[in-house]
Amino acid sequence: MVALVNNMRKITIPSVGGKLVSSGQFQNFIASCILFCCPGIYLAVTGLGAGGGHPDAYHMADVTNSLLYALFTVCGWAGGPILKYLGPRWALALGATGYPIYIGGLWYFDNTGKQGFTIFTGAYEGIAAGLLWASTAYISLSYSCANQKSQFIATQWTILAFGSTVGSFIAFGINYHSTSTGVPMAVYIIFIIIMACAVLLAILFIKSPSDVRKSDGTSALSPSNKTFGQELWGLFEAAKDWRLLCLLPASFASQSTIAWQSHLNSYYFSLRTRSLNNVLFWVIQFFVPYLFTLILDAKALKRRTRGIIGLTIQAVVIMATLSGELGWIVSKHIDLHDTSPDLDWTQRGYGGALVLYLLMGIQYGSSIVSVQWCISLLSSDPDKYARYAGLYKGTQAAGMCVSFGIDAAGVSFLGQGIIYFIFLFVMCASQLIMTSIFGKETDRLSTKEHFTDDKSYIDGVMPSTDTYMNEKTSDELDKKSLPSDQVYV
């Protein structure tokens, strides 16, 4: 792996140039398109249930996904140092290769019923996904100005959701008249082709951070060119930040409902109905991130005020949704050990089930934005963003790993719902507490803190410090309450 990383750094394939391409917003758009092609399409497959295969294969999917997200966790945590060593361009290109390979593994399983190769491809995707997600999170945080954080995050998630919607429409169109429980070969082929395009996007359009300019004209500082060992030590130091540790439970919980919802969709509905559910689940997420952004980035309100308002609304919706879904499971006596009702959209009872499924889509999309927005309160240092991004995505993957592990263990739908009620309550509470404490603060590290032991930089360019000094915050900070060895504005 070390040799591969070193060789990739030496590759000098030219990328597309131009002022537009080098803007932070365009770079975030390209990162979003990569999410469209890879995780977006992958989540469409996951939403079909059982990893896109036959519903009786859900145990194989749970085992594979547990391994995938376990490796995703480890590689996500290490993603920051690897990202800073490779640079975003090659980190994204390498990370994108895991998704088409994994879909190929699912295709192989659907045709042969043999699990070995599928489990291997799941393991490879876990490694690749940790790198891809750390890179996209870094871009959303480092290439945006102080008042654009949630906008950049929302752009990534909305375009990813569009990818999942396109994938779901493809599957829905093919499955509309299908009576089979499996996924047709055409779905796999189309998905693999779309995912492979992400590798080309990364190679052709992603620029070095030293070449990227934010919308206010300042430089998106290039991560420092420390040794890999120094970067790992920096990761360890970041992991000791108690503020970040307080938000990691929120990261853990934010997407942990994925296996529960996927299995419910696979178990309770017919193939064409769960394909329709999948379409609508992602369509609603076109709107959720940007509606949430209108609150979190509202210039008329102070940052802490708008954060508390937005996160309180989110908490009420999430808790009400989970309460409703638990009530639905109890009232319908839904038990995974019973025969599937195979509910079709033409049958009575579908409307209420669909509403609950869509509300869980609101939880899913809003949680992505809210956790990253809370993490953006902690710092404006690109070095820290790279490390925070890896720790955040790795911990989020750990929650998804546990989610698939719980499902694979045969825990009842009701039992899983209670677990996720607790998880998401902790998420909402920790976000509100951290926003109330740190909502007014933005870490503007001094030149001394960021550059003391850094003598060389990516592309040999000494980053400008004007990014730290020129970003404006919406709030005034009571400097008397802050430690004297740090600079805040």
Curated annotation (Swiss-Prot):
GO molecular function terms attached to this record: transmembrane transporter activity
Membrane topology per record: Multi-pass membrane protein
Transmembrane segments: 29-49, 67-87, 90-110, 119-139, 152-172, 186-206, 276-296, 308-328, 351-371, 397-417, 418-438
Cell compartment(s), UniProt: Membrane
Chief subcellular location: membrane
Record key words, sorted: Membrane, Transmembrane, Transmembrane helix
Pfam families, per the entry: UNC-93
Gene Ontology biological process terms in this record: transmembrane transport
SUPFAM superfamilies: MFS general substrate transporter
Cystine pairs: none
Cellular component GO terms held in the UniProt record: membrane
InterPro entries hit by this protein: Ion_channel_UNC-93, MFS_trans_sf, UNC-93-like_regulator
The name this protein goes by in its record: Uncharacterized membrane protein C6F6.04c
Organism per entry: Schizosaccharomyces pombe (strain 972 / ATCC 24843) (Fission yeast)
UniProt lineage: Eukaryota, Fungi, Dikarya, Ascomycota, Taphrinomycotina
